[in-house]
Amino acid sequence: MNHGESTVIETVNAAKPNFKKEKLLNAMKYRYATKRFSEKTIPPEDFEVLLETARLAPTSFGLETWKILVIQDKTLREEMKEFGWGIKDKLDASHFVVFLARKKADITFGSDYIRHMLKDVHQVPDEVYEFYKNAYGNFSENDFKTLESERSAFDWAGKQAYIVMAHMMVVAALMGIDSCPLEGFIPKEMDRLLGEEHGLFDTEHFGIAVMAAFGYRGEDVHRNK
């Protein structure tokens, strides 16, 4: 999924949502961490809605410190099973999503990435850029200390990926699409496989934060919420 494109999002002129809260609650009751998926495939237009949901999801400071990989290649999915002790059955789902998070160098103020996001994407004027510099600097160095280490920086960037994943899962439930968030993999080995061996992302800038499977349940639910 591409990020960093200059896009105007019509929030002010967008229609106010108009649906009963019972619909949302029913979707949340219907949703569960699906263990086995059927062979049914999500229609392309429906999955596009989930990708657009990801794009519109909020992130801290609007920096979008994440990226999405949609893994549809069956051969690659088989390779992933070696380093995914808790994802094997879920790799049979209609769509399998890997959420990446940026590393410390990219989320340090003054980096090419942050400058690109603020200047090129959000097109903030110089005075707002300076405000971001002070506010984000204080946040990352003093308040949350996100830049104390490579790990703390990646964990913070990864939190943004989890926000995006959660939004996708909620909208999926509203559409009758099942999902399962996944952490059952070996990050170092999966980074090497997808990033270094297959070249799907630059491991100098990204690491895998979390994964999720989307599709339709292939099992009966035995436990009520």
For each feature predicted by the language model, list its residue ranges.
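Acidic, surface-exposed loops and disordered segments
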Residues: 2-225
